[in-house]
Amino acid sequence: IKVIHKCTSARHSLKAQSIGCDAVSVDGFECGGHPGEDDIPNFILLPRAADELEIPFVASGGMADARSLVAAMALGAEGMNMGTRFIATQDAPVHQNVKEAIVGASELDTRLIMRSLTNTERVMNNDAVERLMEKEKALGDQLTFADIVDEVAGVYPKIMHEGTMDAGAWSCGMVAGLVNDIPTVKELIDTIMDEADAIISKRLSNF
């Protein structure tokens, strides 16, 4: 069994290496879900990981296409990991409403929630997220998980399976702004590899 540990900082990546992980997924601030508490984007985080690590790592957060792959490898990663982009594929076992929400979103449509709980999550903005943020604003440091349980607990089946998009907060990366279609996984991967080869052999051939 190979273990790839998600890490959101260079220091966490080093810890994963020290306890025997085979590789790490280095997640920048752009990522959907939990980006950690350091707010370091991948243009800084990936080279930092490359400077520190001896084990291989893949880049996560903001990854969507051939440009992402080539850039990630230039910054030291062995490849890239995609979350939000893969959700918006025909093969993803989620409701069509979720896929269309990602395609219809821009890079401005995510929000960071639960920062005061030191459990920061990047989510797609919707009515439930707006309610949650109003609670955060009103309660400040007094906010507890119990105050927002209706917006975050048990909501994924309603969203991902039933397509009730305002049922609660759901993870989505800023990369939604780069997602414009819903291909099959094979089509997506084939396109990424073909376009990455073209970038390297043509656009970058003179460097």
Show which residues each predicted segment covers:
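Active-site glycine- and acidic-residue-rich loops that bind
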Residues: 1-8, 132
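Glycine/Thr-rich beta-alpha phosphate-binding loop at enzyme active sites
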Residues: 6-46, 89, 93-95
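Conserved active-site-proximal phosphate/metal-binding subdomains
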Residues: 36-58, 63-207
